[in-house]
Amino acid sequence: MTVNPDAPALPTLPLAVETIQGLLPHRYPFALVDRIIDYVPGERAVGIKNVTFNEPQFQGHFPGRPLMPGVLIVEAMAQVGGVIVTLMPDMPQGLFVFAGIDQVRFRRPVVPGDQLVLSAQLLSVKRRRFCKIQGEAMVDGQLAASGELLFSLVE
């Protein structure tokens, strides 16, 4: 296991999509964070996802009544959490993937034109391989989704 010596120092906010792509492996159509607007090292991050009608999932989910799939809302929360973990200088190199999703609840639909405000709070890190994050997705100040997300390092 190697330590990530290339983890960036404290970033200048906001983080634009180009910077986020330097931190996370996700690319279109699964790069779901447009901007990081708040970041506290090793603790929390807040990101923005602008939901647009031209995203591929809306072709079939659902014709005539487009709704952002819940799994993509959860993935967007996870990507914000991934920024926290990736910027931790003592974390090993590798790919963090889902190990579990607990207590996820969806409270309101997310539709094209909405702006998701995605919050991630780091709850725990175990053996530098497992992380637990509390995520929330808000639209217009209303809770759209929340839950605990667990990650595991794949080397």
Curated annotation (Swiss-Prot):
Main location: cytoplasm
EC number, UniProt record: 4.2.1.59
Pfam families with a match to the protein in the record: FabA
Catalyzed chemical reaction(s): a (3R)-hydroxyacyl-[ACP] = a (2E)-enoyl-[ACP] + H2O
Keywords (A to Z) from UniProt: Cytoplasm, Lipid A biosynthesis, Lipid biosynthesis, Lipid metabolism, Lyase
Paired cysteines (S-S): none
Record: active site: 61
GO biological-process terms attached to the record: fatty acid biosynthetic process; lipid A biosynthetic process
Cellular component GO terms held in the UniProt record: cytoplasm; membrane
Subcellular location as annotated: Cytoplasm
Role played: Involved in unsaturated fatty acids biosynthesis. Catalyzes the dehydration of short chain beta-hydroxyacyl-ACPs and long chain saturated and unsaturated beta-hydroxyacyl-ACPs.
Entry similarity comment: Belongs to the thioester dehydratase family. FabZ subfamily.
Protein name, per record: 3-hydroxyacyl-[acyl-carrier-protein] dehydratase FabZ
Organism: Synechococcus elongatus (strain ATCC 33912 / PCC 7942 / FACHB-805)
